[in-house]
């Protein structure tokens, strides 16, 4: 599999990723895809951050979720809850 990069996600902002959970799926909307400062000159990719919004009132734990998107395909993404706003919970994924 190709190493994921910011370019895989940049065109998907404000689009829904479906996370597999038990017998169903949860909707996570990608609300931000941003580059992070380069830390190592020999890094395999440029680091980046993704922020997802989930409108459920339930806080889901940090873990790897199998996410599906029409263009990105199915990928395992480790997300961590970082905030709550009026629209739901915000989750972050860091790729470095």
Outline where the language-model segments fall.
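Conserved hydrophobic positions within beta-strands
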Residues: 30-32, 79
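Anionic-ligand-binding alpha/beta catalytic cores of soluble enzymes and soluble regulatory domains
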Residues: 1-11
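Short, compact, well-ordered microdomains
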Residues: 62-96
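Short, conserved beta-turn/loop elements at beta-strand boundaries and strand-helix junctions
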Residues: 34-39, 83-87
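A glycine-biased structural micro-motif
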Residues: 11-14, 18
């Amino acid at each position: 599999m190709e190493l994921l990069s910011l370019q895989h996600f940049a065109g998907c902002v404000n689009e829904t990723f479906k996370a597999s959970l038990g017998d169903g799926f949860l909707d996570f909307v990608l609300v931000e895809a941003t580059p992070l400062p380069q830390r190592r000159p020999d890094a395999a990719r440029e680091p980046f951050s993704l922020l997802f919004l989930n409108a459920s009132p339930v806080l889901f734990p940090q873990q790897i979720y199998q996410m599906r998107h029409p263009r990105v395909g199915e990928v395992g993404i480790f997300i961590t809850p970082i905030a709550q706003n009026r629209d739901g919970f915000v989750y972050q994924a860091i790729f470095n």
